[in-house]
């Protein structure tokens, strides 16, 4: 009869603890890039929609991640990964 392999990996922290730590990190980053009023209103909307549940926590994390990603792609002044806005010159020298 087959037996399940023993857990040989490192001890992992509980999912809930990890999720709350992730939320704190994302909130700290969001506060650096967005007005607090916007973030408060987003939090209120999530709370009104999901209440005080883990689904609400996950929705807030997902929304903040999407907002930060778009913010960085558009070209955050603090970021090195934003789209660089360059003007193209017609009939200019080609890159080869």
UniProtKB/Swiss-Prot annotation:
The gene is vpr. During virus replication, may deplete host UNG protein, and incude G2-M cell cycle arrest. Acts by targeting specific host proteins for degradation by the 26S proteasome, through association with the cellular CUL4A-DDB1 E3 ligase complex by direct interaction with host VPRPB/DCAF-1. Cell cycle arrest reportedly occurs within hours of infection and is not blocked by antiviral agents, suggesting that it is initiated by the VPR carried into the virion. Additionally, VPR induces apoptosis in a cell cycle dependent manner suggesting that these two effects are mechanistically linked. Phosphorylated on several residues by host. These phosphorylations regulate VPR activity for the nuclear import of the HIV-1 pre-integration complex. It is found in: Virion; Host nucleus; Host extracellular space. HIV-1 lineages are divided in three main groups, M (for Major), O (for Outlier), and N (for New, or Non-M, Non-O). The vast majority of strains found worldwide belong to the group M. Group O seems to be endemic to and largely confined to Cameroon and neighboring countries in West Central Africa, where these viruses represent a small minority of HIV-1 strains. The group N is represented by a limited number of isolates from Cameroonian persons. The group M is further subdivided in 9 clades or subtypes (A to D, F to H, J and K). Belongs to the HIV-1 VPR protein family. Keywords: Activator, AIDS, Apoptosis, Cell cycle, Host G2/M cell cycle arrest by virus, Host nucleus, Host-virus interaction, Ion channel, Ion transport, Modulation of host cell cycle by virus, Phosphoprotein, Transcription, Transcription regulation, Transport, Viral penetration into host nucleus, Virion, Virus entry into host cell. Homooligomer, may form homodimer. Interacts with p6-gag region of the Pr55 Gag precursor protein through a (Leu-X-X)4 motif near the C-terminus of the P6gag protein. Interacts with host UNG. May interact with host RAD23A/HHR23A. Interacts with host VPRBP/DCAF1, leading to hijack the CUL4A-RBX1-DDB1-DCAF1/VPRBP complex, mediating ubiquitination of host proteins such as TERT and ZGPAT and arrest of the cell cycle in G2 phase. The keyword Transferase does not apply. Residues 1-42 are annotated as: Homooligomerization. It comes from Human immunodeficiency virus type 1 group M subtype H (isolate 90CF056) (HIV-1). The modification Phosphoserine is found at residues 79, 94, 96. InterPro entries: RetroV_VpR/X. One of its GO terms (biological process) is symbiont-mediated activation of host apoptosis. One of its GO terms (cellular component) is host cell. This is Protein Vpr. Its main location: virion.
């Amino acid at each position: 009869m087959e037996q399940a392999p023993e857990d040989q990996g490192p001890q992992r922290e509980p999912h809930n603890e990890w999720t709350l730590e992730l939320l704190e990190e994302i909130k700290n980053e969001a506060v650096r890039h967005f007005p607090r009023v916007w973030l408060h209103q987003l939090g209120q909307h999530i709370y009104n929609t999901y209440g005080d549940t883990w689904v609400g926590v996950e929705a807030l994390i997902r929304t903040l991640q999407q907002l930060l990603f778009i913010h960085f792609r558009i070209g955050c002044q603090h970021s090195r990964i934003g789209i660089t806005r360059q003007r193209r010159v017609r009939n200019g020298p080609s890159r080869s």
